[in-house]
Amino acid sequence: MTNSSTAAHSPLPPLSLYIHIPWCVQKCPYCDFNSHAQKSDIPEQDYINHLITDLEQDLTYFHHSVKNRRLHSIFIGGGTPSLFSAQGIAFLLSEIKHRIPFSPDIEITLEANPGTVETERFLGYTQAGVNRISMGIQSFNDDKLRVLGRIHNAIEAKSAVDFARVLRSQDKLDSFNLDLMHGLPNQTVEQALDDLRQAIELAPPHLSWYQLTIEPNTMFAYRPPTLPNDDELWDIFEQGHQLLTAAGYQQYETSAYAKPGFQCKHNLNYWRFGDYLAIGCGAHGKLSFADENSATVNEIIRYSKTKHPRGYLHGEYLYEQKNVAKSDRTFEFFMNRFRLLEPVPKAEFEQLTGLSQSTVESQMIFALKQGYITENPESWQITEHGKLFLNELLELFLESE
């Protein structure tokens, strides 16, 4: 592998770390994530030890990319990471920090299920170093929660959010996010908007508001429920977007809304084509490499870890690794970048893909004519029209080189 630049002006993007904890209380019928229903005691300490060894191997194997870099953010996802004790999370974060430095303003997010978090555990996570909690609320309607297979009810959800608000008021938590879904089975427009109003009333700094989609190999795929039609979905989105905007939330990504200054750093790094280490069952990572004193990236790799806990707990970590060909980089870059509503700096395209702007000139001319984007000398900007035709826009880059 090629050496990364150690110069002050390295072309490498920010570096994050994703940690996957695969266990949950029960598998939700819509979930296609790598999660495994808890059937016995979770081997918490054993798994944490393997996570640390996994990270050590990555830091050695990918040394030319990660040397002299600090972690910009950490995201602990699942599964249900809040099944792990606060002591376990504290030990894990401490061991990580001993192996790779943290940025002074690092964002550390932990996903939590309201049905698995007591107030003491919440407090313990913040004492462990977690400064952002992401809560999988999904709905405040108990009937919908049952259909979705969630283990919490609306009262438990609001109680968890209230405690997160208290922790934030005490400066023990920088931010918190609520995950909320719409387009649920047999959901009316008014029910979806009522969910959103209740979420807004709780004043989270960040809201992830996304449409339920039926994914392959899920229980919903085998027994499809009745979902709102396209007209109803459009009404939900349009009226919901107005509610969020009126409440002071800014949409910065397809499904992400935040109060000013509370965008999720970790997800922004994904969408800005940043780098991320990945440890844990089924975790996916991306790393860039650059030659000494180079102004641009010249190699990008993607890799994934062993999915099943059985193999992972036997020390079989790395499952697959591949180089991202130059012919694929434009599509991958814009597939991420055009999810964001901010301008795309042309200089960053060259820096992070190692390609010249001329490689996408014809595609951009066509996109301009179609009204998918606007352009100035420094950047490209997706339009409202472009958001509606995002797939058509991205198809332009499938074979560019």
Where are these regions (language model features)?
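Short amphipathic alpha-helical interaction segments
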Residues: G354-F366
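Local cysteine-cluster metal-coordination motifs and their immediate loop/turn environment
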Residues: P22-S35
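A short, conserved structural fragment
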Residues: K369-E378
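Beta-strand-connecting loop/turn residues
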Residues: C24, P205, D275, E378-S379
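Short, amphipathic alpha-helical interaction segments positioned at domain boundaries
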Residues: K387-E401
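C-terminal scaffold of the Radical SAM
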Residues: T2-S16, F33-F62, R69-L355
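Basic, amphipathic "hinge/linker" alpha-helix immediately C-terminal to the N-terminal HTH DNA-binding motif
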Residues: W380-K387
